[in-house]
Amino acid sequence: MARHSFFCIDGHTCGNPVRLVAGGGPNLQGANMIEKRAHFLAEYDWIRTGLMFEPRGHDMMSGSILYPPTRPDCDVAILFIETSGCLPMCGHGTIGTVTMAIEHGLVTPKIPGVLMLDTPAGVVKAEYRQEGQYVEEVRITNVPAFLYARGLTAECPGLGEVMVDVAYGGNFYAIVEPQEHFRDMADFTAGELIGMSGALRKALNAKYEFVHPEKPEIRGLSHILWTGAPKHAEAHARNAVFYGDKAIDRSPCGTGTSARIAHWAANGKLKVGDDFVHESIIGSLFKGRVEATARVGNVDAIIPSIGGWARMTGYNTIFIDDRDPFAHGFVVV
């Protein structure tokens, strides 16, 4: 029997939690972060469930673990852990992780103000603005984002048949726009959106296959993005992103914003250099931009950037005790 100890720095990015595991993470094998992610899931997923699920975490909990980079052009590697699994990329998690890692001296960048990040989804550039000891803003240049499919349909409890477009921004997103049975996310409570989202995601994954054109290890639709008219004067659009078993992102969602930018660009609503301000369900904003065009396999793509802020909320030494019947956490659905 053993008691495993993890030192965590807790914070949030624009309202959504980030738990940076600064001590106690396992050593991982693998030539790259995709292989290290696979090793973690095969042998150490109990750490993710123990730190993210109740009673040590909650439905919206999201986190990260830092590792030495697997490639010479990066400063640090990040493994993302969430209630929904080990995501290839997490935008809000990156902004929070960079903020807390720089403020606490966990990473020394080769170039001040810039961190090159080795993630399972690929290389992500993070530029940060520091004033004194605090990081005030982080802008990430994400992996290529693209429209994956148009006009997919599935049955959704409470709505009937729903049509979605699917875009990739580091994860696959089903984007629900206004249609016969859905006008605006504002017509529903967060609980109602959660109730519909799990069934819709399950139906779409059962009916269609979602595989990254260049990285077949990245597969499956993980998020539902409900859209709405903006309430904030600066925002171009509003969203509520469902992930995990019953979570709605409190931030505008970094990879979701990337997917939305790619969707708008594919529909001719954005071009290189255009800004896109995305509003969350609680009114916080991410400031996105189309940085460049790209290709992913045979698919047209864009390079998005996302700007946002994060704040630390405290330190947390967490024990996972083998004697605890809930050592590996639980979820109440």
From Swiss-Prot:
Binding site for substrate: 91-92, 223, 249, 254-255
Catalytic activity: trans-4-hydroxy-L-proline = cis-4-hydroxy-D-proline
EC primary class: isomerase
Pfam families in alphabetical order: Pro_racemase (PF05544)
Protein name: 4-hydroxyproline 2-epimerase
Keyword Lyase on entry: no
Signal peptide: none
Similarity remark: Belongs to the proline racemase family.
Catalytic-site annotation from UniProt: 90 (proton acceptor), 253 (proton donor)
Protein EC: 5.1.1.8
MF GO annotations: 4-hydroxyproline epimerase activity; trans-L-3-hydroxyproline dehydratase activity
UniProt keywords, alphabetically: Isomerase
Record bears the keyword Isomerase: yes
